[in-house]
């Protein structure tokens, strides 16, 4: 059997670029929309999540079977849960307890373990706990907020893809 895609990771990217046909007001501007919701985990965060894990692997910082830890409140956590599952990592996601049930369900569907912090502690509390857990040797924090591999995904993937789809115009 020949498959077009070997893993879900192969489905990340190459999302459609469409021209908005109608806009409110009198404008002659062209507006193009990149449909990143077509990525497997459903958002623009799929690319950075896969990038952060893949590039950390290439640097020898993490290996399949390791535990990854991340503070999140949404789409990055869902995408990291997916990417970790694909690549064989245990994923612990730390989030404020007022995060939506739907996001939590998506994360656990990919096998992530969730830890809640109080809504009063918020994302800062989630980040602090992630750092403490890493200091205790309980896993490796990817740190989406300061990790250069996060935006790099768009320089190496999204940008060239848009250039190709528009013919450079």
Swiss-Prot record:
Q: Does the keyword Transferase apply?
A: yes
Write out the ranges of the annotated region (Disordered).
Answer: 146-169
CDD domains for this protein: CBS_like
N6-(pyridoxal phosphate)lysine: residues bearing it: 45
Which biological processes are named by the entry's GO terms? cysteine biosynthetic process from serine
**Where on the tree of life does the source sit, at the highest rank?**
Bacteria
Task: Tell me which positions the record assigns to the signal sequence.
Answer: none
Q: Tell me the enzyme class.
A: transferase
Keyword field: Amino-acid biosynthesis, Cysteine biosynthesis, Pyridoxal phosphate, Transferase
Residues holding pyridoxal 5'-phosphate = 75
Q: Which cofactor does it need?
A: pyridoxal 5'-phosphate
Q: Which InterPro entries match?
A: Cys_Synth/Cystath_Beta-Synth, P-phosphate_BS, TrpB-like_PALP, TrpB-like_PALP_sf
- Pathway(s) this gene product operates in, as recorded in its UniProt entry: Amino-acid biosynthesis; L-cysteine biosynthesis; L-cysteine from L-serine: step 2/2
Catalyses which reaction(s): O-acetyl-L-serine + hydrogen sulfide = L-cysteine + acetate
Q: Might you give the EC number(s) for this enzyme? A: 2.5.1.47
Q: Which GO terms describe its molecular function?
A: cysteine synthase activity
| The family this protein is said to belong to | Belongs to the cysteine synthase/cystathionine beta-synthase family.
Q: What is this protein called?
A: Cysteine synthase B
Species for this entry = Pseudomonas syringae pv. syringae
State the taxonomy lineage: Bacteria, Pseudomonadati, Pseudomonadota, Gammaproteobacteria, Pseudomonadales
């Amino acid at each position: 059997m020949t498959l077009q895609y070997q893993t879900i990771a192969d489905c990340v990217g190459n999302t459609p670029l469409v021209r908005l046909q109608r806009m409110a007001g009198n404008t002659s501007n062209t507006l193009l929309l990149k449909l990143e919701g077509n990525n497997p985990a459903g958002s623009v965060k799929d690319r950075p999540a896969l990038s952060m894990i893949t590039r950390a692997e290439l640097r020898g910082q993490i290996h399949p079977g390791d535990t990854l830890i991340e503070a999140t409140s949404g789409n990055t956590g869902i995408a990291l849960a997916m990417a970790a599952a694909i690549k064989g990592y245990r994923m612990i996601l730390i989030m404020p307890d007022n995060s939506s049930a739907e996001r939590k369900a998506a994360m656990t569907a990919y096998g992530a373990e969730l830890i809640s912090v109080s809504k009063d502690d918020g994302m800062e509390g989630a980040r602090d706990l992630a750092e403490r857990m890493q200091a205790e040797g309980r896993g490796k924090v990817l740190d989406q907020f300061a990790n250069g591999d996060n935006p790099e995904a768009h320089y190496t993937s999204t940008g060239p893809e848009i250039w190709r789809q528009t013919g450079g115009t």
